[in-house]
């Protein structure tokens, strides 16, 4: 009884077979069918290779949300060279809460030569070229994000020659931690001293003729320091044409969480607007000579995530390519073969012309029976 039920079940399953097998003796092969099959297999191979390259590629997904972190500190990474001796300049930060962060908390003053060596000039030229391309091709930023920690650092290479020239500039580099409110990082004449109403600089002790705020920004970033990330002001160089010149940078900082297959970092992107002018109180251009970077933080936070096509989606797309090409080429081959047969082979005039009479074995004839040519039945 069980065997009988099993046979019934198997026969029922066989009847439900959606892929019936045609015996090879009933399959007709042709040169045109082989040509179409060759084209189909070649197309499938090319599309499969292209689809696999798409599967291997990644893209950056951007999401936006309100930044709810107000209590943490903001890190500012600085590497700026000013064409003045270190004893003549001072750097510090003053925010909207009147909180002063002195440069002694994390910055190093290093005497150096302002002019770059040949190798350093080549580095600066390449960095400026990348900056110009980034301003035109914004999608290149995705490539930079994905290459983080994958390439070498973008820091200024050390001087390869032992210059006998005495130091005529000051390299200010390091990092500071400030409150997450708008502030002003500035480099001006004289060392900073605390003041009940803010702070002041001892500019009176410096000769006015020694003022020269020509400067080079080798690196400026906010948040966690991520090597190989190029920031908007990296490689910037400004030459002062007057002793009383002020350089201003208005910066909008956007908190950014970066998640790639290489790293995860809490960093910050920023945009900048530059302005420079000569201080002339008689002409109404007031201010103080120096370099001023006024930054403000955006209330929005950007999450940048590197994404990859899931395997199931790749598999479905691959099945669609194979099945679609098989179905389409089969249909096109059938239509083409039908058209060729109509024009050249089957339905020529006279192929179905009836004969006048049909002889039978008993000797009589039938003139009304249509008969194909070469047919004796």
From Swiss-Prot:
It is a multi-pass membrane protein. It comes from the Eukaryota. The keyword Cytoplasm applies. It is found in: Endoplasmic reticulum-Golgi intermediate compartment membrane; Golgi apparatus, cis-Golgi network membrane; Endoplasmic reticulum membrane; Cytoplasm. InterPro entries: Erv (IPR045888), Erv_C (IPR012936), Erv_N (IPR039542). GO terms for cellular component: COPII-coated ER to Golgi transport vesicle; cytoplasm; endoplasmic reticulum; endoplasmic reticulum membrane; endoplasmic reticulum-Golgi intermediate compartment membrane; Golgi apparatus; intracellular membrane-bounded organelle; membrane. Keywords: Cytoplasm, Endoplasmic reticulum, ER-Golgi transport, Golgi apparatus, Membrane, Nucleus, Transmembrane, Transmembrane helix, Transport. Possible role in transport between endoplasmic reticulum and Golgi. This is Endoplasmic reticulum-Golgi intermediate compartment protein 2. It comes from Homo sapiens. The gene is ERGIC2.
